[in-house]
Design a protein with these regions (language model features):
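Glycine-rich phosphate-binding loop plus the immediately following alpha-helix
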Residues: 39-52, 242-302, 375-378, 438
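Early-domain small/polar-rich strand-loop-helix modules and first-structured segments
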Residues: 1-96
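Glycine-rich phosphate-binding loop of actin/hexokinase-like ATP-binding domains
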Residues: 4, 11, 15-18, 24-30, ...
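A solvent-exposed, charged loop/short amphipathic helix patch at secondary-structure junctions
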Residues: 77-104, 267-291
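Phosphate/oxyanion-binding active-site loops and adjacent basic polyanion-contact surfaces
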Residues: 66-70, 101-120, 144-152, 203-207, ...
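Gly/Ser/Thr-rich loops at beta-strand to alpha-helix junctions
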Residues: 10-12, 139-146, 231-236, 337-341
Length: 439
């Protein structure tokens, strides 16, 4: 069975498919045809409702084209101020999964999300039949993880119902259905664990999914690391180490309801603009970038304080030893926002800046790798790639901070036991204890 990594984004959606033939693995990004019929690696997360109430998805304007004749990068899509005669709906993903007020009600956003996901499901089932399992990402922190995962499952189950039961895989009939009628046909299905297993749906925090290609390739050194995924609507952060099984051990998941939308004040932009893409760093407002960076710093400071607190509890060593250990730790950047140099900076001890590129991927297994790399799409496609790496379960949880020092604590306990046994052998006197006391 194929594994589909479904990265439902605020600005654009990316899909990667893992094909497994015996021991051979291949990863291929699903391509979407724009209004000119040119294949693109991303689909704009935009819905257009025309004067007749009919809905279009993704590429709304015939004016958006690939002038080079090649698959182009996100940034080269020219932002058109007009070109679609009707209502344009954007940022429904952000309104579905965050508390950001962007003018769309929660329930309306959920319905838009169901329809948009359905649109992509039609194409996936046309190409692969039903021989695939979806692994989808969600923006979340540790506290909201289960609720956010359930929301994703409900949206996917509702979309499957529309595609397979209501429209019987007839995409044209789906597109001919006016919005009001489509709303009447749509049911927001309650969460059901059995249905989740039936469809082999797995859901992962977006900040976790980004880690998988790097971990599989042994691209991150052991020790404490930070991943920052700057998206359109949110910025997701994971604090993790690599365990002896070469899998990430997550100690903190954080999601900030600020991404490129906030940085560019997109909510007050021209609503008729077709493209959601940020074309250059000049669109990022300085005062908003400073505010954004302060929120990241706040997360890092919280991490630092928690680490220091646990270190003092569990160790007799000076705090400077922890400070030294945190010097020049990796901070890994991914997501569309990370493509701008001004957005990649060190935070506290995390000073070794890594930007996702071809060298962090298992490039020999990725179809069109050279083209994707040349277009600078690796950080944009990274989450969908990570999501497509087949997993057996999605029981991801944050381990307690005290366990970061578990091995260190066990070594200290073992040393203490040795001292005790040595002292007993000499009638309760231990030269080791005496030396420690002198030190």
């Amino acid at each position: 069975m194929r594994t589909v990594g479904f990265d439902f984004g605020t600005h654009q959606t990316k899909v990667c498919v893992e094909n497994r033939e015996g021991a051979e693995l291949q990863y291929e990004f699903f391509k979407f045809k724009d209004a000119k019929g040119v294949e693109q690696y991303t689909l704009p997360s935009i819905i257009g409702i025309d004067k007749k109430g009919l809905i279009r998805y993704g590429f709304l304007s015939d004016e958006i084209s690939n002038t080079s004749g090649l698959l182009q990068s996100i940034k080269s899509l020219v932002s058109k101020q007009s070109g679609f005669d009707g209502k344009i709906v954007r940022y429904f993903k952000q309104a579905t999964f965050t508390s950001t007020n962007n003018g769309i009600s929660k329930m309306d956003a959920i319905f838009y999300s169901i329809w948009y996901v359905s649109y992509i499901l039609f194409d996936l089932e046309e190409k692969y039949g039903q021989d695939f399992a979806i692994q989808m990402g969600v923006p979340t922190d540790g506290e909201r993880l289960n609720l956010q995962k359930q929301l994703v499952v409900r949206i996917l189950l509702s979309a499957y119902r529309l595609v397979e039961e209501v429209f019987k895989n007839d995409k044209d009939a789906f597109l001919r259905t006016p919005a009001q009628q489509l709303k009447e046909k749509t049911v927001f299905i309650p969460y059901c664990e059995d249905r989740k297993e039936e469809y082999n749906i797995l859901v992962f925090p977006e900040a976790y999914a980004c880690l998988m290609p790097l971990i599989k390739q042994n691209k991150i050194a052991s020790g404490m690391s930070l991943m920052i995924d700057i998206g359109g609507g949110t910025t997701d952060i994971s604090f993790f180490t690599i365990n002896i099984e070469n899998t990430p051990q997550v100690y903190g998941l954080f999601s900030i309801d600020k991404g490129l939308n906030y940085l560019t004040d997109a909510m007050n932009a021209n609503r008729k603009r077709i493209s959601s893409n940020v074309e250059s760093a000049s669109e990022i407002l300085k005062e908003r970038r400073i505010s954004f960076e302060k929120e990241i710093e706040s997360v890092c400071l919280k991490l630092n304080n928690s680490l220091a607190q646990e270190f003092r509890k569990q160790s007799r060593l000076p705090i400077s030893r922890l400070t030294d250990a945190l010097k020049a730790r990796p901070v890994i950047y991914t997501g569309g926002g990370s493509t701008f140099d001004i957005m990649r900076k060190p935070y506290l001890g995390f000073k070794d800046i890594i930007h996702i590129s071809k060298k962090e991927w298992r490039s020999e297994c990725v179809v069109d790798m050279n083209r994707i790399s040349a277009l600078g799409l690796c950080p944009i496609l990274s989450t969908s790639y990570g999501l497509s790496i087949s997993m057996t379960h999605d029981n991801i949880k944050c381990e307690p901070f005290r366990d970061i020092f578990k091995l260190f604590r066990e070594i200290q306990d073992e040393e203490q036991e040795k001292r005790f046994q040595y002292g007993r052998a000499f009638g309760g006197f231990s030269y080791t204890d005496d030396w420690d006391a002198v030190k």
